[in-house]
């Protein structure tokens, strides 16, 4: 690695020193770098999708039940440019949500169709971001209020709106109400080809989630 002469970090840059073990040279640690190493999302989350009308949202479902609510990569706001995010939706401010202890007591209970945040775009458009699943609101990502462009810039999963925690007994029903990655891609393909689309969770799942008991 080339560095400037006055670089204060120069003493800390990695420099390989040849090492021999059992008559064989040990390869430098940089040789073990995998450019295609699975991302955090690929390793620990399952991707699901929720449609509000024709607008897609992503639910990243962790093995411990924690769910990250995000914009799907094809959400139109990402192409339009995001100008603001607000968790004060009028009758309640989601950012004032407070949970306590390991049991996350006190958090707001949200329905799939509950408005989680308001998003405005550079062209003046407004989107009511849905909660996508029924669950307890654990926290909201206030960083995207201060820097809305993070939703466009951060890698998958990092630019989330909120963390929700569904009840264990509701997990199977919630997963069934969402689209899998394969179903999502099939829906997008059908839309592009003008074919009948897989029922969106904005219609199908909202009714199904209402049947799930709190």
Swiss-Prot record:
GO cellular component: dendrite; filopodium tip; lamellipodium; nucleus
Renumbered residue ranges of the record's region Disordered: 189-214
Residue stretches of biased makeup (Basic and acidic residues): 201-214
InterPro entries, A to Z: Abitram, GCV_H/Fam206, Single_hybrid_motif
Gene3D superfamilies cross-referenced by the UniProt entry: 2.40.50.100
Any one GO BP annotation for this protein: regulation of filopodium assembly
Coiled coil: none
Protein function: May regulate actin polymerization.
Protein name in UniProt: Protein Abitram
Organism for this UniProt entry: Drosophila melanogaster (Fruit fly)
């Amino acid at each position: 690695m080339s560095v400037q002469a006055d670089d204060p970090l120069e003493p800390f840059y990695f420099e390989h020193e040849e090492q021999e073990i059992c008559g064989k040279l040990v390869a430098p640690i940089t040789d073990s770098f995998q450019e295609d190493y699975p991302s955090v999302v690929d390793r620990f989350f399952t991707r699901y999708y929720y449609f509000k009308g024709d607008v897609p949202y992503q639910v990243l479902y962790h093995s411990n039940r924690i769910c990250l609510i995000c914009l799907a990569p094809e959400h139109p706001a990402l192409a339009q440019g995001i100008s603001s995010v607000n968790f004060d939706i009028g009758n309640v401010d989601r950012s004032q949500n407070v949970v306590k202890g390991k049991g996350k007591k006190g958090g707001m209970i949200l329905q799939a169709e509950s408005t989680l945040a308001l998003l405005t775009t550079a062209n003046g458009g407004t989107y009511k971001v849905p909660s996508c699943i029924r669950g307890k609101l654990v926290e909201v990502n206030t960083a995207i209020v201060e820097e809305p462009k993070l939703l466009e810039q951060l890698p998958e999963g990092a630019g989330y709106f909120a963390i929700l925690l569904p009840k264990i007994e509701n997990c199977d029903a919630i997963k069934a109400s969402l689209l899998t990655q394969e179903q999502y891609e099939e829906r997008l393909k059908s839309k592009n080809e003008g074919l009948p689309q897989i029922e969106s969770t904005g219609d199908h799942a909202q009714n199904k989630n209402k049947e799930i008991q709190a």
